[in-house]
Amino acid sequence: MISFLLCLAILIVGYFVYGKIVDNTFGPDDRETPAVRINDGVDYVVMPQWKLFLVQLLNIAGLGPIFGAMQGALWGPVVFLWITFGTIFAGGVHDYFSGMMSERNDGASIAEITGKYLGPVMQNVMRVFSVVLLIMVGTVFAVGPAGLIVELCSQSGASGVLTSLLFWLIIILVYYFIATFISIDAVIGKIYPIFGICLIIMAVGVIVGIFTNPAYTIPEIWDHFGSMHPSGTPIWSFMFITVACGAISGFHSTQSPLMARCMKSEKQGHFVFYGAMVCEGVIALIWAAAGCSLYEVTGGLNTGQIGRAHV
């Protein structure tokens, strides 16, 4: 448990110290942002900072720091180190610069920015790559929640269409299209902050539950500094690609332009982009700790056997 708290403290300190170094390196100033200068009422809309943060958090987080971190717990508490230092020195830097570069280029997408600096060939490559990536991620982020809703409905005694995976997939896809085609502050700006708060509350509830229940203990890094993977899978490089969201994910660069078009000031970038990534790192750290704590051994993540962690 001590190692978890240390990693949590390092993440928080990293936001204020290294995050500020990153911010100063970029050099935000008082120039007009795209949201103020363009302000078309659709994609370019000034939104309050707290809302920017929560929307950005949900855009980059979602299921990623939960599923990935829980799978990362298969390697044991050593995953805490990757989440902590990956977030501070890689993920936060990536998210900040991808968002601020977009802001400096009138809210351009990652493909457009790539084309500006690397030419039209790489721009088209990035466009294809982004579309394929977004389809894959969108599929997971549709099937995952739909499956959870079906499970909840089944457990509550519901039947018929409410327990149909296809039904909930259609509902989610309809929501996708509505949120995409109308003004960003009409749906995303109103609903996403609520979901973002729910994501944070859920993580806080998990860690409070672990701390207040003496039956569970978070194992220490120094007691298990090595791979605990039940299949003997090595830490390098499999743990690093398993835990992407929550440490570093290139996918975030496709999402950052959304909020880059809604900032009132460049000085909000530190909190919105770097801060949201640190918050995602904290969420991933909590779920990784839950994975290490709630299961008898790390193999329990595969078998579903819950018990007291070995420390």
Predicted regions and their residues:
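Transmembrane-helix boundary/entry motifs in multi-pass membrane transporters
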Residues: 38-51, 57, 103-134
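Helix-loop junctions at the membrane interface of multi-pass solute transporters
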Residues: 70-74, 98-102, 242-268, 272-277, ...
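Membrane-water interface regions at transmembrane-helix termini and the short interhelical loops
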Residues: 101, 112, 143-156, 172-195
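Hydrophobic alpha-helical segments and their helix-loop junctions in multi-pass secondary transporters
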Residues: 138-156, 163, 167, 180, ...
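Helix-loop-helix junctions that connect adjacent transmembrane segments
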Residues: 193-196, 202-253
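Extracellular/periplasmic helix-exit of transmembrane alpha-helices
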Residues: 210-221, 276-308
